[in-house]
Structures are given as C-alpha cells and as structure tokens.
Amino acid sequence: MTDTATENTTESAADYGRPAFVSRSVLVTGGNRGIGLAIAQRLAAEAHKVAVTHRGSGAPDGLFGVECDVTDNDAVDRAFTEVEEHQGPVEVLVSNAGISKDAFLIRMTEERFTEVINANLTGAFRVTQRAARSMQKKRFGRIIYIGSVSGMWGIGNQANYAAAKAGLIGMARSISRELSKAGVTANVVAPGYIDTEMTRALDERIQAGALEFIPAKRVGTAAEVPGAVSFLASEDASYIAGAVIPVDGGMGMGH
C-alpha cells in the first residue's frame, strides 16, 4: 500500500503542470551590494544569466557588471547594449538602484527632493523603457521593482523617498495594464526594515523605533528578500501583474 501511495503521489506531482525552468537574461540595477547583490546572487545560483549595474565599483565575483548611472539616459542605453551583447536581450529586469536623502519636510530642499525622485523613480522609468523594447518583441518580460514599506506607509523625514517608492507601485500597475497582453508583467517587492548599509546609517533612535512596528521583533536580512523576486521572475508568476509583495516581517500588514 505504501508503494502504491508513493507512486500515485509522484504521478500527481508530474501531472500538476508546473512550468519547466527557463534560464533568463537578467539585469539587476544596483546589484553590486546590499539587497541588489543578494538578489543577483540568488538568481545566478538558480542558473539565470545575471548582469548587474554599478557606479564604478566593479562587479562582484561571478556576475557580469556594467557601469551605469540610472539618472543618465545615455549611460542606461550603453549598459543595456553591453548586457545584450554579453547575454542577450534583458528578459527579467530588477530595478533596485536608488538613494535616500532624508530630511524634515521644512528643511528638505527642492534639489534634495528632486534628486531622490530622479534616481529612484525616473531612473526606474528609464531602465524599464529601455528593457520593454525587446520584451515586447519577444512577448515575454518580467519587470520587478524593489519598493519599500515607506512607499505604502509613509515614513517621517522621507517625503522624497516615500513618494518615489509609492510611484513605483503606480508605474508597475500602469505598465501591467499596458503590456500584460504582450506577456510583460510588472510587480513590486516591498522590503521593510532590512539590515543594509543604508539602514545602519540611520539614527539609533530611528532604528530602535522601527522594531516597535515589526511583529517579528527583528530586523530582516538582505538574504530574505530574493525569494520573492525569484518567484516573480519565474514561469510560475506568469499570471501575476501589478502586485505588491511585502517582505517586512509584518510591519505594513499588506497596506
């Protein structure tokens, strides 16, 4: 009876119809450190062809690197051309590059506000527009934005950062409505309080205060973010579009 049950289970799994794995050409912007690096390494370990952008630091071992400033259209085009020559047109774009320049609203200059929007939101638009050309032709594409709980909750002193991250959600949903019929989807992974160079630089009072809102009562690690990205990049996620997946220990509770 045990053998029969095992055999039936195996047959059921085989008949389930899960799509076969396909190795894709992946580009992770800002993939040379922190969350971006963890994502790039995870996707490379899964046998995808992975390239990362950096701003002069070079690529980590095992990854193909291209220098790129996402605030510069010409630099974006050059980076994509290099990636295309190395591993083919980008099929999975992980838009992760970004900056933060926090300040009280009344002290935040327009220059500081605009600088963050340009890097985090307009930069994402630039790389998306460039990637979408070949994705539409191939009728396959996965666009994954690395957002933030800040873009859903709003966090004090981050009017610029929160606005940019919230904008990614609207952009992903607009793109999904426009391009899903061509096999191109856009989704957002929204990390919460993750241990990175950026969060370590925050005031200790802010770090301590953040834990009060996290049911898990701990800071997340960069290694806990790539799983959601891997899923959205996979064949299994073909019918998911315009979604926001929080990776925040329950901090935002889906807001």
From Swiss-Prot:
Catalytic positions are: 161
A Pfam cross-reference name: adh_short_C2
Binding residue positions for NADP(+): 33-35, 55, 69-70, 98, 161, 165, 194, 205
Supply one GO CC term from the record. extracellular region
**EC number(s) reported in the record:** 1.1.1.100
Keywords, sorted A to Z: Cell wall, Fatty acid biosynthesis, Fatty acid metabolism, Lipid biosynthesis, Lipid metabolism, NADP, Oxidoreductase, Secreted
Q: What is this protein called?
A: 3-oxoacyl-[acyl-carrier-protein] reductase MabA
